Amino acid sequence: MREGSIDTTGSLDRTLAAITRGALYVTVAAMPFSIAVTQTALAVAVLAWLSRMAVQRRLLLQRTSLELAFVLYVAAELVALVFSVNVPNAVVYLKRLLLIATVYVVGSNVESERTLQRLMATFLLAMSLYSLWGVGSFVVNPSVRVRHIQNSMTAGGLTMMATVVAAAVACEQKETRVRLLALAAAIANGVCLFLTNTRGSWLGLAVALVVMASLVDWRLVVVVPVLAILAYLAVPGEYKARVSHFFDPHYRTNAYRITWWKTGWRIFKDHPVTGVGDIDTGAIYRKYMGPEETQAVGHFHNNFVHIAVTLGALGLAAFTFLMVRILLLLVAARRAARSPALREVTLAGLCGFVAFLVNGLFEWNYGDAEVATLLWWLVGMVVAAVVLTRRSLAVGAMVVEVPG
């Protein structure tokens, strides 16, 4: 290859790499404000990344321990599509599979600890601004729960995970100024989360913080229930009522969920292997709803119940396997991380995933595009941390082998 051609190729590759990184910053900055901007920026990042592969004529893809799980899950989606009761609708919902690319575009293009930290800072700044807006909207109109675009569940899921991320940074960060800023972000997002009045997200945060405390310092575990008790004593009566009925099966929203899950079980029994397809379940729900029900639901407010109904036993097995593989990856990454930057990212990823799983027992948060995008972004950040850990270990081995 001629020298001029090499220079041109190198310049193009650097430009595409810069576009990829810039698009990733836009992705996280837009995450709490606009799913359209978020996914457009993500698409730009993916296209620029693929273009780099074409220019370099090699695969710029970081392998993970998740490939088999992803393949099985995608296969379950496609099998369910073939046997769906509403194939056109199932085709539309295949778009959720595209979000998985987030794991690889982030994991393969974040090439330094500084970039990891800057992406985390960008995310927390955006989420803190969003949370301050949410608190302000509540002050103006306290009769309305804080909402994100159209529902409080999305706001709850986003602020729940942002609070976890901020708390992780505060726990692992060595610089006092940054630690205080992270703590402020955790408080802002935590207050906004509380004002969404979404109990499933509250519980997800509480469990995640207990896990985080146990990983950082077991003595901190007692802090979480103490904070919860103090918060309970300080809140107005209507919030106390919702907390006190957390596990009351007769409480209105709890009773609704139990009814929805029972109806989901009836649908599953008639479609046990491949489910009804990844669709809006409103139409088929009407055929199975009991005489006491007045409204059909388009999803089942539980990730595993919804997957069982829509993808059947095959899909439920594949989805559960994927969740387990992700958890194992996050645990291994946390154990391997050495530097403060890598430890805060892996702690945020692991505890954020725990919060997502717990919240997903009460909401279809995997089907929420905003929350799912955030989930895959966090997993991608941990993949990048794993890559950086391997590189640092390799460099360390070289230093040991080469005499000084």
Show which residues each predicted segment covers.
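Membrane-interface micro-motifs in multi-pass membrane enzymes
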Residues: F33-A41, V92-K95, H148-A162, G200, ...
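A membrane-periplasm/extracellular boundary helix in multi-pass inner-membrane enzymes
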Residues: G136, V191, L195, A213-N254, ...
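Membrane helix-loop boundary segments at the extracytoplasmic
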Residues: T27-V37, A308-L311, E344-A384
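Alpha-helical transmembrane segments of multi-pass inner-membrane proteins
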Residues: A45, V74-V79, A101-V105, R114-P142, ...
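Long extracytoplasmic/lumenal interhelical loops at the membrane interface
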Residues: F247-K262, D270, T274-L311
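Transmembrane signal-anchor hairpin modules in multi-pass inner-membrane enzymes, especially those
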Residues: M1-V92, A101-T102, S108-A121, V169-R179, ...
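Juxtamembrane membrane-water interface segments that cap and precede transmembrane helices
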Residues: A23-Y25, V139-H148, T294-V305
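Hydrophobic alpha-helical transmembrane segments
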Residues: A43, G312-M323
